[in-house]
Amino acid sequence: GRLGWFDRWFCSPSNHRVHHAVNDAYLDKNYGGILILWDRMFGTFKDEDAQEKCVYGTRGLLNSWDPLWANAEVYAGLAHDSWHARSWLDKLKVWIKPPGWRPADVAERFPKPAFSMAQMQIFQPPMSRAVQWFALVQFAVLLTGVGAFLWQADTAPLAHNAIWFAVLLVGQWALGAVMQGRISMLMALMLQSAALATATSALGLTEWHWLFKPLTMAIAIILVATSAYSTSARGTSGSKTPWVLLMAALGGSLAGDVFLMFPGFFIPGLVSFLVAHLFYVALFKSG
């Protein structure tokens, strides 16, 4: 919809739709994040045309839910062209020329297919109902976490912000990987729990660390057990010894973590870790 006078001054939904569209008429338009007045002044404004629906996306299809790659993909392309350009001047111009510019020799050796609106397809890898619910819950939790992070970021020390930023990044990457089918839901939970265990340890949040570190080990044991079961169910040949050794090593590590949480249990904790290391050594020797 349109918002009348608001559209003329501010970055309204209509104006921002144009910014995210790949249609020829809308390309590189409406940069203003708050005031659209700047685009009107500098000639980059384009009003949304009711006869031409905005098609969202990028001209180089990302085809990924990876938040890291979504931010790095453009720079990776620039670095590729800069590296392969034969002229030193072209190596520099890659970084300062308008979007889409490429050295002639690079474009000849590494041609890109011409953009076509017919190629614009929604990136929608198949997801089971369980993964869809997992993604919904995870997104709600991550959105809450990002909100809490932004709320306190200006008063927290830089080191604390860096740690929590890394935790949120791991969480978002893991969720995207699950949605693409690259890792399982259990693997994502293990990575997220490990990130929280590391963060709470670094920040001295002992009680929370006592929760997340054993939880990480417990999820790892379940992950190994389910992997061993699925391998056995598929009838894949091979010894079960490595699986048993790995589960025993993880179990010993988990026991060591739990023992060390309580005063007076240092020796049992130390013994548990030593036993776990013996199982790890046996696992490595088994190949």
Model-derived segments and their meaning:
Residues 2-138, 176:
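Cytosolic/stromal cytosol-facing helical appendages immediately following the last transmembrane segment
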Residues 41-44, 143-153, 278-285:
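Short hydrophobic alpha-helical module
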Residues 189-287:
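Polytopic alpha-helical membrane-helix bundles and their juxtamembrane interface segments
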Residues 5-6, 35, 174, 205, ...:
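Alpha-helical hydrophobic/aromatic positions enriched in membrane-embedded helices and signal peptides
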Residues 76-82, 110, 138, 160-168, ...:
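Hydrophobic alpha-helical transmembrane segments
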Residues 125-191:
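Substrate-recognition/cap regions that form aromatic- and gly/pro-loop-enriched pockets
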Residues 3, 124-134, 156-160, 185, ...:
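Membrane-interface helix-boundary signature
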Residues 47, 149-153, 178-181, 227-234, ...:
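Perimembrane helix-loop junctions in membrane proteins
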